[in-house]
Every structure is written in structure tokens, then in C-alpha cells.
Amino acid sequence: MKHLLKLLNPSLLLPIVSLLLVSASCKKDDPTPPTPHNDEEVITTFQFKITDSASNATTTYFFKDPDGDGGQSPFYGPTASTQSDSVLQLQNNRTYFVQVILMDETKSPATITSDEVNAEGQDHMLFYNNGSTTIISASNPYTVKLNGSDMVIKYTDLDSGSPQRGIGLTTRWRTYTTGKYPLNITLRHQPGVKDGTYAPGDSDISVNFKYQIN
């Protein structure tokens, strides 16, 4: 490099040095590509924990699709891994505290996906429906009535949005009419469009149970 600099006209060195400095500056200032963020929740297990407010007894029911999009067949519980459906057993004129736990069991240890849903509650909402559902209150606490059984479901959690809205991971159920009824629970992913209604966004998971009020 010393010999090269001697041969060059000094008047030519300044543009060359400037070019080298600009090139180095551009390399230094080149932004690092951002790491892609995966917003899709992986859910292989939907679990209900139902606590009778009178007896304080808790019963767990679940739906599992062990390998997600793989070839294993999904199943219900709690009694056996071969159940084709699950019936939630409830007593009439009772109040129940209900918690939904969502998991990704393709990982070891399993990931509690409902923790992520709760943390991003302003983008998520669980909807409970039996084919004919009436919204009793769209404000807090968000409350619906499942027509036919007249069971009332009141949301007991709130997101961090403004205004705050229910998420549906924890709810309080009140039973009124005996019989056996269908129940669909759908988790809607509604980033930036959550308004307390089902329509906006996409479904992360939708599971069908039945409930028996005795």
C-alpha cells in the first residue's frame, strides 16, 4: 500500500479516502434485518377446570389433538383417551367458576399457551355458544346467556386495552334449566380490531363439548 500511495497524485487521494469512508459508514449503518415475529398460537390441548362454588370440588375436562396438524386422532377426556366427545356435568341452580387452560404439548415441557393469550388479551377473546346465544351485557363484565338452557356465563377477566374488554379464560357460570345441550368454544384472534363481537379476526381454535344440567 505504501508504494501505491507514492505513485498516486496526492490530489487524487482525497476522493479515494472519502469513498472508502463512505463505504465503511454505509456498512456500519446497514440495519440488521428484524427477526420475524410469529403471532400464531399453537394449541394442542383445550382444558376446562370447573369448580362448584357450593362444594369447592373441581372437575377437569379436556380436548387434545396431540400432534397438532399431524396424523394422530384428537380425543376428549377425562375418563379415557378414546372418548369421541365430552359432557360437562353440572347441577341445576348452581354457580361454577370455570378456567380455560390452553397448551402446546408438542413441546417438552409443554407450553401454557393461555398465558400468552392472557398477556395479549387485547387481541384475543373466547366466545361461548350453544347455537342460540344472547349477549346480556357487552360492557364489563361481558355476559351471555345460552338460550334453551338459560345458563348465564359472565366473564371475570379483563384485557389491558382501552376500553378494557373480557378475554374469557376465566368465567362464572350459573345454571337454570335441566337438560343436555351443545357447547362451542372458539378463541378469536383479533389484533387491532377486538370490539367485543365475534366477527373480527380469525379463529385460533374451536372446540365442541356438551353440557348436562342435572
Describe each PLM feature range:
Residues M1-L5, S18-F48:
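Bacterial Sec-dependent N-terminal signal peptides
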Residues E41-T59, T177-L183, L187-P191:
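A composition-driven surface/loop motif
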Residues F63-L90:
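N-terminal edge beta-strand
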Residues S86-R94, I153-L183, Q190-D202:
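Exposed beta-sheet edge/beta-hairpin loop segments within beta-rich domains
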Residues V100:
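Gly/Thr-rich phosphate-binding loop signature of adenosyl cofactor/nucleotide-binding cores
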Residues A199-N214:
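Short beta-strand elements
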